[in-house]
Amino acid sequence: AMWAESWQNQSYWLDGLEPLGNSFEKITTNVDVLIIGSGYTGLHASIQIARAGREVLVIDSGEPGYGCSTRNGGQISTSVKPSQGKLEAKYGQDQARAIRQEGENALEWIEEFIKTEKIDCSFKRCGRFHAAHSQEQFNILVKDAQKLSKQEDIPVEIVSKQDQRKELGTDLYNGGVIFPRHASVDPAKYHRGLLNLAIKAGAKIAGNCHAEKINKVLSAYEVLTSKGKISCKQLVIATNGYTSKLTPWLQRRVIPIGSYIIAT
């Protein structure tokens, strides 16, 4: 059979969490701020807005957090896809460093946020291994890592093919680089923590509420949803990889990327 007996049609990260139930079904028809998307982006925005004293509603086409926020690999790194060399070639050394620094800042920020807000989500600085599929790729990884270490004081560990079994238990790759400060988190627990913070701050959350059309009305907005019309003074689009024709301008600028992990 193609599917294992333990296969289930929901994220394994959700195991052990209480089901959300029907407590997120109602909508508020008139709010200061409406947020479309209840993932990390939408909930973080709702927490700050609600704490500032404004009435905010978060809607989602599925259950809160049904998308990538509870189905990702849980890795937290400082990395961006292009290498340091490619960033410098396109943007120059100063801008390339600024882009890299944003990643460093984000990792420090989320650790402090989790600690300050007391979110139980198994945050851990476990390190991350970047494996090389060829000797050529290994040479590139090492060159970039040494440059990052020298220019930005980022800790790195070079692992040869001979030593990688100590890290991965396999000889498949051609060595790699360890970034020891990279972290991991239980993404579903982190999302649930954000959800609880948003509710505590006074935000309203409505799941299974699909946004179908956005109309601009003078200086405000009317959003037609599967549960009725919602009026708001300000609108936040927090749909990320699920961005659709609802917002064509944003859709043209977002590229969904698949990410896969193996649960063992």
Where is each model-derived feature located?
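Short phosphate-binding/catalytic loops that engage adenosine nucleotides
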Residues: R54, D153-I154, A203
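Central helical "cap/lid" subdomain
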Residues: T225-T264
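Glycine-rich FAD pyrophosphate-binding loop
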Residues: R51-R71
